[in-house]
Amino acid sequence: MRELTKRQNEIFEYIKQTVHAKGYPPSVREIGEAVGLASSSTVHGHLSRLEEKGYIRRDPTKPRAIEIVTEQLGEPINMEETIHVPVIGKVTAGIPITAVENVEEYFPLPEHFTSTHNSDIFILNVVGNSMIEAGILDGDKVIVRSQTIAENGDIIVAMTEENEATVKRFFKEKAHYRLQPENSSMDPIYLDQVTVLGKVVGLFREM
């Protein structure tokens, strides 16, 4: 295989480390941040050189689709299968949660992170500290299984009256529904009606 420049080697090593640690490759932005390149076009250029030299393969139709062809000793990397899960940026009343209008991007998750079919799963970026006592922190990505019903005590994603998605613990009580924060400094939300968008089944945190 053709020799790499210093910068190409830095990028290749970072891709390998990320694949080994997470099971999927980094994004162009993450590569740029790791090696000190502000321009995404410059990163794309280096990735093209790595591909030309036979170190990686890319699929232009998929995000983060970088496959390592070989390691230095010629051993193939055991790269875990991933699925591309929609990341929901907003919630629009009257249309499915994973409709194109709601999707900000697609995020690759190792297949073992989900126990159901890809079409039943979406990701929501957590904003705020209302669930910190359940271990769900600001900036986390919660993995959500689409469903319209919930049992008492489930952590769910619900639609508020302002058509925003909120993560809370669900309780159906005698005269109302209670959406309970997992933060002792915050009050519960009481609603006559609640729209359940899904149940939180996992969490992903980027360090």
Curated annotation (Swiss-Prot):
Catalyzed reaction equations: Hydrolysis of Ala-|-Gly bond in repressor LexA
Known DNA-binding region: 28-48
UniProt site positions, description: Cleavage: 93-94
Keyword Lipoprotein set for record: no
Active-site residue list: 130 (for autocatalytic cleavage activity), 168 (for autocatalytic cleavage activity)
Superkingdom to which the source organism belongs: Bacteria
Claim: Chloroplast is one of the keywords in the record: no
Gene3D superfamilies xrefs: Umud Fragment, subunit A (2.10.109.10), Winged helix-like DNA-binding domain superfamily/Winged helix DNA-binding domain (1.10.10.10)
InterPro entries reported for this sequence: ArsR-like_HTH (IPR011991), LexA (IPR006200), LexA-like (IPR039418), LexA/Signal_pep-like_sf (IPR036286), LexA_DNA-bd_dom (IPR006199), LexA_repressor (IPR050077), Peptidase_S24_LexA (IPR006197), Peptidase_S24_S26A/B/C (IPR015927)
Example GO molecular function: serine-type endopeptidase activity
UniProt-listed Enzyme Commission number(s): 3.4.21.88
Keywords: Autocatalytic cleavage, DNA damage, DNA repair, DNA replication, DNA-binding, Hydrolase, Repressor, SOS response, Transcription, Transcription regulation
GO BP terms: DNA repair; DNA replication; negative regulation of DNA-templated transcription; proteolysis; SOS response
A Pfam family reported for this protein in Swiss-Prot or TrEMBL: Peptidase_S24
PANTHER family named among the record's database cross-references: LEXA REPRESSOR (PTHR33516), LEXA REPRESSOR-RELATED (PTHR33516:SF2)
Purpose: Represses a number of genes involved in the response to DNA damage (SOS response), including recA and lexA. In the presence of single-stranded DNA, RecA interacts with LexA causing an autocatalytic cleavage which disrupts the DNA-binding part of LexA, leading to derepression of the SOS regulon and eventually DNA repair.
Family, similarity comment: Belongs to the peptidase S24 family.
Quaternary structure annotation from Swiss-Prot or TrEMBL: Homodimer.
Protein name in the entry: LexA repressor
Naturally occurring in which organism (per UniProt): Staphylococcus saprophyticus subsp. saprophyticus (strain ATCC 15305 / DSM 20229 / NCIMB 8711 / NCTC 7292 / S-41)
